[in-house]
Amino acid sequence: MDLLYGLVWLLTVLLEGISGQGVYAPPTVRIVHSGLACNIEEERYSERVYTIREGETLELTCLVTGHPRPQIRWTKTAGSASDRFQDSSVFNETLRITNIQRHQGGRYYCKAENGLGSPAIKSIRVDVYYLDDPVVTVHQSIGEAKEQFYYERTVFLRCVANSNPPVRYSWRRGQEVLLQGSDKGVEIYEPFFTQGETKILKLKNLRPQDYANYSCIASVRNVCNIPDKMVSFRLSNKTASPSIKLLVDDPIVVNPGEAITLVCVTTGGEPAPSLTWVRSFGTLPEKTVLNGGTLTIPAITSDDAGTYSCIANNNVGNPAKKSTNIIVRALKKGRFWITPDPYHKDDNIQIGREVKISCQVEAVPSEELTFSWFKNGRPLRSSERMVITQTDPDVSPGTTNLDIIDLKFTDFGTYTCVASLKGGGISDISIDVNISSSTVPPNLTVPQEKSPLVTREGDTIELQCQVTGKPKPIILWSRADKEVAMPDGSMQMESYDGTLRIVNVSREMSGMYRCQTSQYNGFNVKPREALVQLIVQYPPAVEPAFLEIRQGQDRSVTMSCRVLRAYPIRVLTYEWRLGNKLLRTGQFDSQEYTEYAVKSLSNENYGVYNCSIINEAGAGRCSFLVTGKAYAPEFYYDTYNPVWQNRHRVYSYSLQWTQMNPDAVDRIVAYRLGIRQAGQQRWWEQEIKINGNIQKGELITYNLTELIKPEAYEVRLTPLTKFGEGDSTIRVIKYSAPVNPHLREFHCGFEDGNICLFTQDDTDNFDWTKQSTATRNTKYTPNTGPNADRSGSKEGFYMYIETSRPRLEGEKARLLSPVFSIAPKNPYGPTNTAYCFSFFYHMYGQHIGVLNVYLRLKGQTTIENPLWSSSGNKGQRWNEAHVNIYPITSFQLIFEGIRGPGIEGDIAIDDVSIAEGECAKQDLATKNSVDGAVGILVHIWLFPIIVLISILSPRR
């Protein structure tokens, strides 16, 4: 039995946890669009596809519910063309794209999340409709080309237009509409493997009447009011494809800075071809001047070199194309190397042995490259001992060699190779190489104090390799321990003095670096290498870098600072401070963290705590903000009908909120409410007293009155505790004229001034009346009507019919709901969406008549379908009704009260709701009376347990 009572207790705690969420709810989302979509009769798109004309403005709104207020994010997946939504997302309820283009079509997703449950995601597909100008191209049958291009030949006219939706084509000859089969000499067809993309008009064995003006009309059936577009082509016996010629050489070799002009002329073609210039790679230079078929580049550079093509097109046959290559002279990158006698293993230059000097440059064009050799300023010619050669361009382009056979003392001196281009206009490159007894191969060493090299993160460091020898070669630096890039992003860095300078050193740069000699500007021998070790010290990396801790007075708090990484890791010390006050110091042993605790918080214990963990390179810091400030309130945005109007120019607003983590700090004693009119500077403030503790998820309501229509107001709410002010939160409230609520969910308790947009029927006999028990006439008829609204409140409002005189039996009062709009049915999709319609009704009195509910469907003809009916005395209680409805178009609900035979026949309704989805089965099957809603959830869950206890208790 004790186990059973324990089970009851556990279940009660669980249910309290569930109900403790209060109004907190995971997000729901729905997408609506402003304006009307372009409808296609035969397509019948569902509401999840939105069609829009190119160039117009797309506006999609994401309607969300959920508490706390969900964060909204719009994203997009590509449609027919890849588009990444400008590589960004939109964090706003409304997505607005002005001048929408075709590539912006696709599926748009709205994602809402507030940390409760799973994110809510809805999508809508956007189709962008457009129609480009059609283009007609003309071709003759293959293999029949002769001088008279179209004389007694078969001709094909192809019409193409880009569009969405698919285009429909029609042909005309003059004013005559051409149809398949209307003329034996004409055939109209679509090519294989196309889907309405083109339409071909085939003229078989041209006849005299076929020489005429042809028109192709492209149409998308006026979808989105896109007009038809037409293109015409005049076919004659002179119609011919284009031909051109270039009035320039190929290739064209020029010097940098010169102006160049390319001329392209047409030699044939009817109609007259259009001429365009293109470049084989990339676009034309920005400075290019185009004038018809003439292209001018004022001051050419090496970057402008390449192949330029002139293209002529008149939509007859294939376009004509002629090309020329522009070469811009250039000489660059002069370098040399010395190769000792290859038949000896010695790398040194010695008397009596062979030595070879090589020079290399990059030349454009390579055919114009020439080399000249000099010794001590005097020209050298090839001889038996001084052999001058040029390396095969396929092996080593732009390279010349001077072989000195049997080196003699008299051969010592300065040798110069000069590279030049035959065309001139480019400065020569001169390279000097000294051959003497002091010319020796290189050697690399690392100074003793330069490896290992210790530095700190963020410093500037120089890695050094000393190079000896003559001449001194270029030094190449690279990473020796791993295949990673050097600081400049390349795999190797060049140095002319053996020094590698690194700015802003990072910890990732620690490791071994290799310096090695290059063959250029030195000896062509096996590279010399040396290694330099770099050690980068960095201060400790710690977590958390910053943490806010909110805690009430007289409570304890513990702060912990953890070391993630540090170098050097040894001799780590720490110190705790509150502001400038030193609290504690110490040294790490084997642990990776340090803690500081405050057993009982008071005013002097609040503030910023800093924990510094220190090594040779510096300090890492954890910061803790310990505060007693209350968290910000969370405004509730899902209030049903928050705006109501009591006077002509004045409106009121029901402001609701919850308190985030109310138990985190001391009890909230009041809220400071600030309000100011939009655009004004001054805040009007007042305090709202709070009695007792606020529960998590508890909804707090405060009515803002005397607001001026149609002004918007900024509202600021700040919680107050004995610590002081907490975090503020701000929202804007706006007056909006009553509109039809979104059908996702509708609830009306008739509490506001506009009674949720319900209206009286002008064709009935009398009206429904808004009333509460507290405001009803003191001369009311006894023994009929409710004593409170359906929640049990004497101040709550409901709608009722007064059946006292002069009302007569059978007279009707009809109350009309707002018009609810739904999306048109998709004939190829699922069935219509179901909605659960529910309301409370009160029928007490001996003369009760009838209460009917009708579903009025909007269309070309208005139809009223009986939905629900009840009659007779139901007792002094509120009853609930649930009905599933399946509207196929916009609809209204009509409450019709019919007066009974006497004055004790008042009928009332309250809490009308419409929710998407079918009603629960138990709701449809139950019509129980309801006196209040408090505790129902717990009582229902506990009922089986209580029954079980009552059965088992006698057995004890």
UniProtKB/Swiss-Prot annotation:
Residues 638-739 form the Fibronectin type-III domain. Detected in Leydig cells, syncytiotrophoblast, duodenal villi epithelial cells and neutrophils from kidney and cutaneous squamous cell carcinoma (at protein level). Residues 1-25 form the signal peptide. Interacts (through the Ig-like domains) with NLGN2. Residues 932-956 form a propeptide. SMART domains: IG (SM00409), IGc2 (SM00408), MAM (SM00137). A lipid is attached at residue 931 (GPI-anchor amidated aspartate). Residues 27-127, 134-232, 242-328, 340-436, 442-533, 540-627 form the Ig-like domain. Residues 746-921 form the MAM domain. PROSITE patterns: FN3, IG_LIKE, MAM_2. May be involved in cell-cell interactions. GO terms for cellular component: extracellular region; plasma membrane; side of membrane. Disulfide bonds join 62-110, 159-216, 264-310, 359-417, 465-515, 561-611. Keywords: Cell membrane, Disulfide bond, Glycoprotein, GPI-anchor, Immunoglobulin domain, Lipoprotein, Membrane, Repeat, Signal. Its main location: membrane. This is MAM domain-containing glycosylphosphatidylinositol anchor protein 2. CDD domains: Ig, MAM. One of its GO terms (biological process) is spinal cord motor neuron differentiation.
